[in-house]
Amino acid sequence: MSERNVIQELEARGLIAQQTDSGALQKLLESESVTLYCGFDPTADSLHLGHLVPLLMLRRFQEAGHRPIALVGGATGMIGDPSFKAAERKLNTPDVIAGWVDKIRRQLSPFLSFEGDNAAVMANNYDWFGQMNVLEFLRDIGKHFSVNAMIKKESVQQRISREDQGISFTEFSYSLLQGNDFAELNCRFGCKLQIGGSDQWGNITAGIDLTRRLNQQQVFGLTVPLITNSDGTKFGKSEGNAVWLDPQKCSPYKFYQFWLGVADADVYRFLRYFTFLSIEQIDAIEAADKTSGTRPQAQRILAEEATRLVHGDEALKAAQRITESLFSNDLSALTAEDLAQLALDGLPVLDMAGQGDGLIDALAASGLAKSKSEARTFIQSGAVSINGIKAEGLDYCLTGNDRLFGRYTLLKRGKKLYALLVWPA
């Protein structure tokens, strides 16, 4: 992607929801290397899939010759963005937030290049807000914001209209903080463009207005669309839980499986959003899937590309190895690290501490059988295997020989149902 066509490329991918003064922004991007930023508040100890599109946008702009700033909200994270949130956020302690800031900085770093003429910048807004007192804030920033305009914003109106919730002055002031981030980054780094999710539009335009007032600079905003599944449900949830980017919170195997499960109606759109494959390559994949008469390849390609982007080549190979091993019932290739991934979140797990060693008991306790009677029936019908070997004998007791790497026993019932027994170390 060249810097002369970055906006057209993003539009072709469906990645632009809103932008300010599109003609002037396009002209600016074609005429110089532009510094842009996106903010990431530490609301948890990890980023999740909802952060991935704007994060990849920073990388897309950098590959087009522009300079990205990844701003971690050490200050704004202490307040909490109320935009389209139904209730007040819980306030976390400064120590907790500082720890989360460090983790998120480490997560952001691999996506960007910190070398070359357009080397990325990592910033923390606590650096300028931490020493600012309340009088400075009210005099230098607050006087430029109209309460009349602020309460008309849709995100604020939604909260004000709810008698059971309302909005605190703390959260109401959030847009002032984010607005000042833009002005500060413009002053420090010459930043001229802010990107974010479509729910950030009000905060972004507030920052544009403040930067114009404080710095007499024209700056721009661009948002990415809210990502939803084709059925209208929120994207980025697995069984109701967020899909985290931290491999200790969501294993690479679970991450890979999430993408394999993407619906046919969504997969080509997500290839445009979440990969760096060209539009032509994605169109070719879609055309081939429609004419092949076999299972579509798009989900596999999406899973490979997204897992490689977030977790790297080795983690992708491990996710593929685990997937193939479970599918083939041949566990010989699995490593201790692979089984640890499955123990984290890949399979139903039964902690064997305090459990008996009878196979029937393990089947019932793990949920592979509803009762001991049903467990007996499954064993008698040859539907149960232990570490890939068919179980025989109703009175079978698990021994040390059934423990992979001294810790794990993989039970299987039927063709697809697994449970992982984890023995005390």
UniProtKB/Swiss-Prot annotation:
Binding annotation for L-tyrosine: Y37, Y174, Q178
Coiled-coil regions listed: none
Enzyme class: ligase
Domain S4 RNA-binding intervals: 357-422
Biological process according to GO: tyrosyl-tRNA aminoacylation
List of residues binding ATP: K237
Positions occupied by motif 'HIGH' region: 42-51
Alphabetized PROSITE patterns for the sequence: AA_TRNA_LIGASE_I (PS00178), S4 (PS50889)
Pfam family, one: tRNA-synt_1b
Highest taxon, organism lineage: Bacteria
Repressor among keywords: no
Gene Ontology MF terms in the entry: ATP binding; RNA binding; tyrosine-tRNA ligase activity
Key words of the record: Aminoacyl-tRNA synthetase, ATP-binding, Cytoplasm, Ligase, Nucleotide-binding, Protein biosynthesis, RNA-binding
InterPro entries tied to this protein: aa-tRNA-synth_I_CS (IPR001412), aa-tRNA-synth_Ic (IPR002305), Rossmann-like_a/b/a_fold (IPR014729), S4_RNA-bd (IPR002942), S4_RNA-bd_sf (IPR036986), SYY-like_C (IPR054608), Tyr-tRNA-ligase (IPR002307), Tyr-tRNA-ligase_bac-type (IPR024088)
Catalytic activity field: tRNA(Tyr) + L-tyrosine + ATP = L-tyrosyl-tRNA(Tyr) + AMP + diphosphate + H(+)
Gene Ontology annotations for the cellular component aspect, listed alphabetically: cytosol
Locus of motif 'KMSKS' region: 234-238
Subcellular localization, as worded in the UniProt entry: Cytoplasm
Keyword field contains Signal: no
EC number: 6.1.1.1
Family listed: Belongs to the class-I aminoacyl-tRNA synthetase family. TyrS type 1 subfamily.
UniProt function note: Catalyzes the attachment of tyrosine to tRNA(Tyr) in a two-step reaction: tyrosine is first activated by ATP to form Tyr-AMP and then transferred to the acceptor end of tRNA(Tyr).
Self-association and partners: Homodimer.
Xref: NCBIfam families: tyrS
Protein name, per record: Tyrosine--tRNA ligase
Naturally occurring in which organism (per UniProt): Laribacter hongkongensis (strain HLHK9)
